[in-house]
Amino acid sequence: MGEISITKLLVVAALVVLLFGTKKLRTLGGDLGAAIKGFKKAMNDDDAAAKKGADVDLQAEKLSHKE
């Protein structure tokens, strides 16, 4: 009774296409893709900035411990 079959998924997909239309779904998909791409880019930028900051801290520590 609670199983999700291929037939049920196809019926739901057909209803979504009928309700929203292909143009709106295509636009929504493009917007979602752009949001995911922006999120991944921001995550990579944060990692790079954190690594660069750690390198600067390490260099400053080496300079301050110079005898």
UniProtKB/Swiss-Prot annotation:
The chain crosses the membrane at residues 4-21. It holds the Pfam family TatA_B_E. It comes from the Bacteria. It is found in: Cell inner membrane. GO terms for biological process: intracellular protein transmembrane transport; protein transport by the Tat complex. GO terms for molecular function: protein transmembrane transporter activity. Keywords: Cell inner membrane, Cell membrane, Membrane, Protein transport, Translocation, Transmembrane, Transmembrane helix, Transport. Induction: Constitutively expressed. Disruption phenotype: Disruption of tatE affects the correct localization of multiple enzymes whose precursors bear twin arginine transfer peptides. Export is completely blocked when both tatA and tatE are inactivated. Part of the twin-arginine translocation (Tat) system that transports large folded proteins containing a characteristic twin-arginine motif in their signal peptide across membranes. TatE shares overlapping functions with TatA. PANTHER family: SEC-INDEPENDENT PROTEIN TRANSLOCASE PROTEIN TATA, SEC-INDEPENDENT PROTEIN TRANSLOCASE PROTEIN TATE. This is Sec-independent protein translocase protein TatE. It comes from Escherichia coli (strain K12).
